[in-house]
Amino acid sequence: MAAAVAVAGPSMEVEQDLPGFRFHPTEEELLDFYLSRVVLGKKLHFNIIGTLNIYRHDPWDLPGMAKIGEREWYFFVPRDRKAGNGGRPNRTTERGFWKATGSDRAIRSSGDPKRVIGLKKTLVFYQGRAPRGTKTDWVMNEYRLPDYGAARAAAPPPKEDMVLCKIYRKATPLKELEQRASAMEEMQRGSSHGDYTATRASLVHDASASTGDDYFSSDDVHDSGFLIQSSSSSAAPSGSSSKNGGAGAPREAKKEEADVTVTVASATSLQLPAVSQLPSLQLPAMDWLQDPFLTQLRSPWQDQHCLSPYAHLLYY
């Protein structure tokens, strides 16, 4: 990938394409070369890191404002304090705020581990207003030069109160992705079960509406294939018809002439179907000659000469 880099010449800046160029500086390079030069007022020959007040923009808008970067974006940010020198920086944006995580970490020189070249602060962006807010996956590393005080009296004073910020999105762990996927599967299973329950309830409602005034629940249909009213519940309509002077007799005749009659009762007046409504079980008649005990007692000689009246009664 070719990166467009602005090169500062003697009279003007010329933008050049550098094929294969990637900007992945180390923390020591960011502090000891880029930030220290900007703070001291030295001009860089390569305009790679732009100056921007990132707190006036949301983090998802910053990648389009960076000079360079694919997954990491760098900015020089002037420090905006709430109450004069030494106050707490204002890190509030239009739709959220940046919240620090932990304490600052000292960055030491690789050549001299005893020398601290800067401090690093890690912040996470939250949507909403402090102290409440929704945590996002946008992370910022803020680099600043250390304050040596009187020990660095001989050093040139800084001309600008500037920090260097690195913006990137935190990679989601595989475990969290698996948890999200399982949660989505559970939601889909729950929605499908809810659709099935709603469909079954609608079918039950339609069936109960077609039977007249008798209603039943979906649990009744699940427990029994077909239900009938008990004698106590079925006796009520006959009593009411007798009170009306026999006006319900034609209705009863019409119901008996119907080919199929489905009567559904409530769960408190259910009973098993009557025996008279079930078809009779057809079984073959028993043949006494097939009894093994009686077959042993029977012989042709007995058939001709010794048949008793009892034998005649059994075999003939």
Swiss-Prot record:
Citing just one GO molecular function, the answer is: sequence-specific DNA binding
Xref: SUPFAM superfamilies: NAC domain
Query: Locate the NAC domain: which residues?
Result: 17-170
Q: Which InterPro entries match?
A: NAC-dom, NAC_dom_sf
Q: Which UniProt keywords apply?
A: DNA-binding, Nucleus, Stress response, Transcription, Transcription regulation
Pfam families, per the entry? NAM (PF02365)
Origin superkingdom: Eukaryota
Q: What is known of its domains?
A: The NAC domain includes a DNA binding domain and a dimerization domain.
Task: Spell out the note in the miscellaneous section.
Answer: Plants overexpressing NAC022 exhibit enhanced tolerance to drought stress and salt stress.
* Protein's recorded name: NAC domain-containing protein 22
Source species taxonomy: Eukaryota, Viridiplantae, Streptophyta, Embryophyta, Tracheophyta
